[in-house]
UniProtKB/Swiss-Prot annotation:
Record family assignment: Belongs to the Fes family.
Species annotation: Dickeya dadantii (strain 3937) (Erwinia chrysanthemi (strain 3937))
Principal location: cytoplasm
Gene: fes
Record field: catalytic activity: Fe(III)-enterobactin + 3 H2O + H(+) = Fe(III)-[N-(2,3-dihydroxybenzoyl)-L-serine] + 2 N-(2,3-dihydroxybenzoyl)-L-serine; Fe(III)-enterobactin + H2O = Fe(III)-[N-(2,3-dihydroxybenzoyl)-L-serine]3 + H(+); Fe(III)-[N-(2,3-dihydroxybenzoyl)-L-serine]3 + H2O + H(+) = Fe(III)-[N-(2,3-dihydroxybenzoyl)-L-serine]2 + N-(2,3-dihydroxybenzoyl)-L-serine; Fe(III)-[N-(2,3-dihydroxybenzoyl)-L-serine]2 + H2O + H(+) = Fe(III)-[N-(2,3-dihydroxybenzoyl)-L-serine] + N-(2,3-dihydroxybenzoyl)-L-serine
EC number: 3.1.1.108
Function: Catalyzes the hydrolysis of ferric enterobactin (Fe-Ent). Is responsible for the release of iron from ferric enterobactin.
Keyword Lipid metabolism appears in the UniProt entry: no
UniProt record, GO biological process: chrysobactin catabolic process; iron ion transport
Protein name as catalogued: Iron(III) enterobactin esterase
Gene Ontology molecular-function annotations: enterochelin esterase activity; iron ion binding; peptidase activity
Length: 435
């Protein structure tokens, strides 16, 4: 994480007569961006800088450098946030105040005059459609921040970690480019051909650590498995935490979502999917890597629709799935008004799973749940609070965490490790880091 510079550091940097010169840029590169300055009241000031490869405004065709920051900038705006050019230089810059524990992913989007916003319609619906079409047309221009010292991830994404952001020590090797690929001897990629679901998908089966009793190893189910096996591979972080003694030897089952249509059908409260997992997939996986059938040694994890699905599985089959890791769960489902009409949230009909928990009374099968959502995903944070209150009232054990960030894989990856650790060992790594 970056060390905070004293207040006024960036103003001095930008007012320097050497601003834009090679030595000036070398200093910025050594510091890494975004630059962070200390402020009062639990906030810092972060500054993004970009070097125009074509020089100053006399030679460069660049007219905007949009900052697309998860949960911070408004990508629905007809006038999105742009960095500003320091006149007469190749320096583009923009600063803003943010929570000192914020974390988020971001891209920079340099564009030329032909890509500037069009003249938008006065009709609201048409204007929204025009804005979306225009904004999506800029996606090919998005770049990772070349001055960010961490390795870019997610293709065009960079990571920003403020000084007090929760530790993600398990991911340091990934961030600095030294992470090893998964141990081929521990990884099995198989096809699950489901008769009950009438479809086929990839499954990644991974084992960590050494156990004297393989059949007693915990089972950890990871929904949206393609994300955590390929796009943001979890393996190196799991190996690091297991080697450090923070996680026990375990069996990890990554379930591919197949595609968007299938995901939207199977993850929101679909009994058929979970029956097929229990009847078909778990026996197939256990033949390859034995694991416990104890619900207290079985964790189901997911984000967004996956967070909804993980809790649904636990609530409906607590005798098999006793531990749940839900991140940014879509507990609004199926009431889209929480997204489209959030200002009316207090009058809206709750999501079906919230209602089910509220009306179910005291549970006979208390679950152990790690639940988190981001302060900068307002609708998701609201429905997660609804669900948290319902779960506690029903007698479930819930460890709730609200982080400074958005609907962001960069935040979820840390919560995954922390959640698995708490659910499998009882340790809260963030509490330990504060002691």
């Amino acid at each position: 994480m970056p060390a905070a510079q004293p207040s006024g550091f960036v103003a001095t940097l930008l007012s320097s007569p050497q601003a834009g010169e090679e030595a000036w840029w070398q200093q910025v590169a050594r510091l890494g961006t975004p630059l962070v300055e200390a402020q009062d009241s639990g906030r810092v000031r972060m500054t993004f800088l970009w070097r125009d490869p074509d020089g100053d405004e006399r030679y460069s065709a660049i007219r905007r450098v949009y900052a697309d920051i998860n949960g911070v900038t408004d990508h629905h705006s007809t006038d999105p946030q742009s960095l500003e050019r320091l006149p007469g230089t190749d320096v583009w810059h923009w600063s803003m105040a943010i929570e000192h524990d914020w974390r988020g992913s971001y891209s920079l989007i340099p564009i030329v005059a032909a890509q500037l916003p069009p003249v938008f319609s006065d009709d609201g619906q048409l204007r929204d459609e025009q804005q979306r079409e225009w904004w999506c047309s800029l996606f090919p221009c998005a770049i990772a921040d070349p001055l960010n010292r961490d390795q870019s991830w997610g293709e065009q994404l960079s990571a920003a970690h403020m000084p007090a952001a929760p530790s993600q020590q398990a991911w340091r090797a990934v961030d600095n480019g030294t992470a090893l690929p998964p141990d081929a001897a521990r990884l099995t990629v198989l096809d699950w051909k489901s008769e009950q679901l009438d479809n086929q998908r990839r499954i990644w089966l991974y084992t960590t650590g050494i156990s004297d009793e393989p059949a007693q190893r915990p089972l950890c189910i990871v929904l949206d498995g393609q994300k955590w096996a390929e796009e943001t591979p979890l393996f190196a972080a799991l190996e690091a935490e297991t080697a450090a003694g923070h996680l026990p030897p375990a069996v990890w089952l990554f379930i591919d979502a197949i595609d968007g249509e299938t995901r939207c059908r199977e993850l929101p409260c679909d009994a058929a999917f979970w029956l097929a997992v229990q009847d078909e997939l778990l026996p197939q996986a256990a033949r390859l890597a034995p694991f416990s059938d104890d619900p207290d040694r079985t964790v189901v994890s997911g984000q967004s629709y996956g967070g909804l699905a993980a809790l649904y599985a636990g609530l409906h089959w607590p005798q098999r799935f006793g531990r749940v890791l839900t991140q940014s769960g879509s507990f609004w489902w199926p009431n889209l008004q929480f997204i489209t009409d959030f200002d009316q949230r207090d009058t809206l009909e709750p999501g079906v799973l919230v209602t089910e928990v509220r009306q179910g009374g005291q549970t006979a099968w208390p679950l152990v749940i790690f639940q988190e959502a981001g302060r900068r995903e307002a609708d998701i944070a609201f429905v997660n609070q609804q669900m948290h209150e319902a779960l506690v009232a029903a007698g479930h054990q819930v460890h709730q965490r609200v982080y400074a960030g958005g609907h962001d894989t960069l935040c979820w990856r840390g919560g995954l490790i922390d959640g698995f650790r708490w659910l499998l060992t009882g340790d809260d790594p963030q509490a330990a880091s504060r002691d």
